[in-house]
Regions:
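Charged docking surfaces used in two-component/phosphorelay signaling
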Residues: 14-22
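Acidic, metal-coordinating helix/loop segments flanking the phosphotransfer/catalytic sites
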Residues: 29-48
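Receiver (REC) domain active-site loop signature in two-component systems and cognate sites
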Residues: 55
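C-terminal output helix
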Residues: 105-114
Length: 124
């Protein structure tokens, strides 16, 4: 299992990486949506992307729209953000995200969302 963690916060990227690597997931990171697209285009395929909404250069919503438009349908996308309004959730899902997780969260909440998405990883 390979995951791409996309967030402009180094702390959040490190936190998510720690949670996922404990579960045996190989992780790469990007600090904005454009950097994430560059990684998707130049790396081995990713199974999962955890994507923040608000980022510089290219936000998470635009990134998800782009990867879906480019045919990357096999990447499961979990939006991980502080945006709580229903409009953000609906727009994320309409753009092609598979699920939505509110910050702050813990390991159990992340595991539950991944299970809902059909992502099979080891228990922490």
């Amino acid at each position: 299992m390979r995951a791409l963690i996309v967030d402009d916060s180094r702390f959040v990227r490190s936190f998510l990486r720690g949670l996922l690597e404990q579960r045996g997931v190989e992780c790469e990171e990007a600090g904005d949506g454009q950097a994430a697209l560059d990684r998707i285009h130049s790396s081995a395929p990713f199974d999962l992307a955890l994507v923040d909404w608000n980022m510089p250069v290219m936000n998470g919503l635009e990134m998800v729209e782009r990867i879906r438009a480019e045919g990357y349908r096999d990447i499961k996308v979990l939006m991980v953000t502080t945006e709580a309004e229903d409009d953000y959730i609906v727009r994320s899902l309409n753009a092609g995200a598979d699920e939505y997780l509110m910050k702050p969260f813990d390991d159990a909440a992340l595991g539950d969302k991944l299970a809902m998405m059909g992502v099979e990883i080891a228990a922490s």
